[in-house]
Amino acid sequence: VQEALDAGCDPVAILNEGMIDAMAVVGEKFKNGEIFVPEMLVAARAMKKGVEVLKPYLSSDSTGSNGKLILATVAGDLHDIGKNLVGMMIESAGFEVIDLGVDVPASKVIECYRENPDTKIIALSALLTTTMPSLKDTVAAIAAEDFRKDIKIMVGGAPITQEFADEIGADGYSEDAASAATLAKKLAAEMA
């Protein structure tokens, strides 16, 4: 990234045509079983470091240009590798990610939204079948709030399916980090 900057390449082009396009290839290879989680994490970390190098050169509208997204693993679930990967991919897709961490109760997600009312998307993760009810409860708690019409909810995690996402009232489901970034962009565009 630094070499490209030193050679006079446009920072936005480096991000969009170099890094984001490369991560799309990584995502496809992951989906097709050509690479696995360790390689995906290496690529995501490289992406994150590259974005850090680029940040000073990018105008504020290109970092976070797709808006804010709240990210959390639901109450009772302590898994963060998948969530972190999703966070890096979504951030690299032009979102400002507010990562609440793991074992996050619905009340904390709602409180975070109230502190950041310009948030467009809430992304929730559950990686255990035993925390699927917690995911359902969190979506239900958000649905009961007056701001539900102003946001999109996306869900994911190993045991989650499109059917379950539909059943609990989520707006979107993604099975992996690469498709999560694509889904986030699609949901944000629907709200524009």
Task: Give the residues covered by each predicted segment.
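Solvent-exposed alpha-helices and their adjacent loops that cap or buttress functional pockets
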Residues: 61-64, 145-147
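Glycine-rich active-site/cofactor-binding loop and its immediate structural neighborhood
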Residues: 64-100
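Long amphipathic alpha-helical segments
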Residues: 1-61
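Cofactor-cradling patches in redox/metallo enzymes
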Residues: 40, 86-93, 98-170, 179-183
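Short, hydrophobic beta-strand segments
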Residues: 26-27, 68-73, 125
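A charged, well-structured terminal subsegment
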Residues: 181-192
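Short glycine-enriched loops at secondary-structure junctions
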Residues: 20, 75-77, 103, 159
